[in-house]
């Protein structure tokens, strides 16, 4: 198999680094790096839910995605300055939220909210997939925080791990984890969100330069799922380390009647 411009095989991910405890204030805080793409993912816990959710006994998970002005070579204005959130930002924010809600039992949260924020510090392709992969680790830490505080009705509300990766057809070849140089000229561009149980959460695919046959779709999915297995292993290794902050003390155990 011939090498790509950065020396990788077609089925090889860029170097993946997951750093927990990147900042101190949120319950979960992660810096994830896919090569030169760097995304800070935080998961903050707040008591209560939105008005439409009150009285349901269910929690909620929401997500926001944004890029810092200097994340790309050319500085872009903050969307808050423009006075509106762009369509791409809204789309990716919703994608991150949908992806993470696929793995958590919201009933176990009670009426509490987990707010996930993904901020792209440096972009070189694959920012949304890096955001989802890192956000899962931040979410897992937030769940540990809630469990320590005695806020969960189920101590293990996460049913699976979530990871995401980009795949595409570049120069007629199926490739995984596209940097900007490849993504900008891909004939087919696809993002795949998957669980560690082998199921799919979301598939976003477009024939940018040409149509493509079903056989190519199968190759893209096979390569994406293989890459996600590598990402799941990286998440597992990161989460095997102790919680990087200070966990709250839970409520004291209730006394048995007559004690």
UniProtKB/Swiss-Prot annotation:
GO terms of biological process kind: rRNA catabolic process; rRNA processing; tRNA processing
Pfam families named in the record: RNase_PH, RNase_PH_C
Protein residues bound to phosphate: 88, 126-128
Gene Ontology MF: a single term: tRNA binding
Uppermost EC category: transferase
Signal peptide: none
Gene3D superfamilies to which the protein is assigned, alphabetical: GHMP Kinase, N-terminal domain
Catalytic activity: tRNA(n+1) + phosphate = tRNA(n) + a ribonucleoside 5'-diphosphate
The protein's Enzyme Commission number: 2.7.7.56
Keywords per UniProt: Nucleotidyltransferase, RNA-binding, rRNA processing, Transferase, tRNA processing, tRNA-binding
SUPFAM superfamilies named among the record's database cross-references: Ribonuclease PH domain 2-like, Ribosomal protein S5 domain 2-like
Matching CDD domains: RNase_PH_bact
Alphabetical list of InterPro entries matching this protein: ExoRNase_PH_dom1, ExoRNase_PH_dom2, ExoRNase_PH_dom2_sf, PNPase/RNase_PH_dom_sf, Ribosomal_Su5_D2-typ_SF, RNase_PH, RNase_PH_bac-type, RNase_PH_CS
Coiled-coil portions: none
Family per record: Belongs to the RNase PH family.
Entry-linked NCBIfam families: RNasePH (TIGR01966)
Quaternary context: Homohexameric ring arranged as a trimer of dimers.
General function of this protein: Phosphorolytic 3'-5' exoribonuclease that plays an important role in tRNA 3'-end maturation. Removes nucleotide residues following the 3'-CCA terminus of tRNAs; can also add nucleotides to the ends of RNA molecules by using nucleoside diphosphates as substrates, but this may not be physiologically important. Probably plays a role in initiation of 16S rRNA degradation (leading to ribosome degradation) during starvation.
Protein name per the record: Ribonuclease PH
Organism of provenance: Mycobacterium ulcerans (strain Agy99)
Gene name for this UniProt entry: rph
């Amino acid at each position: 198999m011939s090498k790509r411009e950065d020396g990788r095989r077609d089925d090889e991910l860029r170097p993946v680094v997951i750093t927990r405890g990147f900042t101190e204030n949120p319950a979960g805080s992660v810096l994830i790096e896919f090569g030169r793409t760097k995304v800070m993912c935080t998961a903050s816990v707040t008591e209560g839910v939105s008005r439409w959710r009150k009285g349901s006994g269910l929690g909620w998970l929401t997500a926001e995605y944004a890029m810092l002005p200097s994340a790309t070579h050319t500085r872009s204005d903050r969307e808050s300055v423009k006075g509106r959130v762009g369509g791409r930002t809204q789309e990716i924010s919703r994608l991150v939220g949908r992806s993470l809600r696929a793995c958590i039992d919201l009933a176990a949260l009670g009426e509490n909210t987990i707010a996930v924020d993904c901020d792209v510090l440096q972009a070189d392709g694959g920012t949304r997939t890096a955001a989802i992969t890192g956000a899962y680790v931040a979410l897992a830490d937030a769940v540990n925080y809630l469990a320590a505080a005695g806020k969960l009705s189920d101590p293990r509300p996460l049913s699976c791990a979530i990871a995401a990766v980009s795949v595409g057809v570049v120069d007629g070849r199926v490739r995984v984890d596209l940097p900007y140089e490849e993504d900008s000229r891909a004939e087919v561009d696809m993002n795949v969100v998957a669980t560690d149980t082998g199921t799919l959460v979301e598939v976003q695919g477009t024939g940018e330069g040409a149509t493509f046959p079903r056989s190519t779709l199968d190759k893209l999915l096979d390569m994406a799922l293989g890459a996600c297995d590598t990402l799941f292993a990286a998440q597992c290794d990161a989460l095997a380390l102790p919680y990087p902050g200070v966990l709250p003390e839970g409520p004291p155990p209730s006394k048995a009647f007559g004690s």
